[in-house]
């Protein structure tokens, strides 16, 4: 499998609030890991929220060694959500920040995907398909 990612600021925004992570190599218990986060437009510090959420998820994922990846995903997302919320409460410049979050891992030809918000995941097998 080959992975590819890119972001584009678009025509309306002055700050790119997108953040990507993708690895075809193992990250903790994940045989591979692909994440897209997009800070919520109009919310304060969306760029910080997206980068913080992705980096925190990867940091936590690296510590997971034994559990099945699809069992870990939801727990890690809940921990990341709590961490983003706590940061937004502690520091005034981050008050109200938020982000979308899409993560996927492929285990034995099965994709496990989680999605919070309106970011999209696409699958390509000769045709581009939105998941």
Task: Report the location of each language-model feature.
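PP2C/PPM-type serine/threonine phosphatase catalytic domain
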Residues: 1-131
